[in-house]
Structures are given as C-alpha cells and as structure tokens.
C-alpha cells in the first residue's frame, strides 16, 4: 500500500483518511524505510497538505502522545507556534506564557529545542533555570498549582524518534513543522497558534476547529513572523465555537506604536534569557514589552479573562509591571 500512496502523491492527488491513517500509523511506528519516509514527506509537501491529511496526522500524533491530565480546562490555553520564521525575534510566545499564567490563566506550553532559530522554547526555559524533563504527572501539577506547565516535545511524543534523522537529512519544512502545535498532550480547549506562512492560516484554523478546539487564534505577521506582529499587520484566523472568521489587524488598532523589526530581535540563548528577565522583572519599557503584551492579550482574550484585545494588553502590562509573571517563573524554578 505504501508504494500506491507514494505513486498517488507524485501525481499530486490528496490521500483519503484511510490512506493517511495507514501512512502515519506506520510512519510513527518506525515501519517505513528512510527512502519511503523521505518520499512521502516531500510528496506531501510538493502536493500541498490538505486539511483532511493534516487533521488525520494530528489525531494520530495525539493518540500516540503521553497524555497530561488537567482536571480544570476552563482557562487552559496552548501558545505553541510552528517556529521557523527566520527573523530571529526573541522568545515572545514563551515569555507570554508566564504573563498569561501570572494574570490568572493556565498555560499548557508545548515546545522543543531550537530547530530553525538560535533559541527554542525548551532552550530558554532551561536557561531560566526551569527543569524541562518532567513526567506527565509533574507537568499536570505545575499547571494546576502554578498555572504554567512545560511539555518537552521529545518526552511526550516518543514515536517522533522514528523520523528525527530523516527530517534532519531532508532539511526542509515538512508536515511535522505544523503538527507540533496541533498535538498538545494536555488537549487544551483554547489556543493561540503562530504560523510561518500566511497560506497556512486558513487551513490550520479549519484543522483546529475539526480537532475540537473551542476558541482559537491562528496568526501570521505579514512581516513573516509566526506571532501577532508589532512591526506589521497580522492575518488572523479566529475560531469561536462553530464560527470561523478571517481578518487583518495592526498594532495601531490596539493603541500600540508600530516597531521596527530590529527592535524585537533577539540573539543566542544567553541574550534571549536576559531579554526575558528584563521584561518579566518589569524593567523593560520598550517595544519588546509591547510585543509580549500584544501576544499575551490574544491568549487572555481567547480564554475569556478579558473582553477585548486592548483590555488584554492593559492586563498583560499590569501583570508584567507588578512582576506577577516573574513570580510564576520563580515558582517553576522551585518546583519539585
């Protein structure tokens, strides 16, 4: 059957649910050769992955993941993006997670070490003194007790080990770059998902809705950011239960001054750690804090802690300058 699937992909035909299920079951179980893995990943990429293909693959990844049980999901949000924007910004979605938790939300943060940037979410968490190699039970306790838990992707998606080598050897983005944010082990009902290409916003919004997410924002900054941009307009896909809307926003809509890209760029792990500490300790009054507040606001709005993005920015800044986000960081450092 795998040869038939490869043939179909070379003819740029979409796979059926049954074919995609067969393919990903065998892919994740390590039953395909390196050549077959390379062929199907490039075949899907060249054809363009359909909503059904992405949704089916995401369901299989979630089924095979180590589950994190969170009893109260009423304000549980995931802020994981695809990464890969190559603009070298600091870790805004990770810093936003501390802010959202400090403001009263619960964040199931899902991430990995750097692949395309100098500093991934796992790298910055470690640099900040937070233990990332935790069991599912420990992450569940972090979320319940502190409001933020970090799930280090390799530990919660062990079957991914069967494709790591091939993905590195291929060296281009594949379906796996978008599956991470769609396969949160805590199964959060709310999500803010940044994507590296505008063309992904609409299909991934539909995928999230099909996967049962209650409310979500899928965002792409038109400057290339996989975040809500402070330097340009942002294309947004919004899920509100059964409704989907697509629209564009800009920083000025929320009373923020537009920044230049160099103002929000980071560097290596040490540099990004210092930026994170400066913001969370309430010492930064630059566009970097505006950038964090803007992205935090979308998460605060999606879980219903505020009624508008502008109110979310105000709450995020209040949380930052009252050092409530930094308190979350200290609790995670001391977690045992």
Swiss-Prot record:
Its EC number is 2.4.2.18. Anthranilate 1 binds at residues 81, 112. Catalyzes the transfer of the phosphoribosyl group of 5-phosphorylribose-1-pyrophosphate (PRPP) to anthranilate to yield N-(5'-phosphoribosyl)-anthranilate (PRA). It comes from the Bacteria. This is Anthranilate phosphoribosyltransferase. Homodimer. Mg(2+) 1 binds at residues 93, 227. It comes from Sulfurihydrogenibium sp. (strain YO3AOP1).
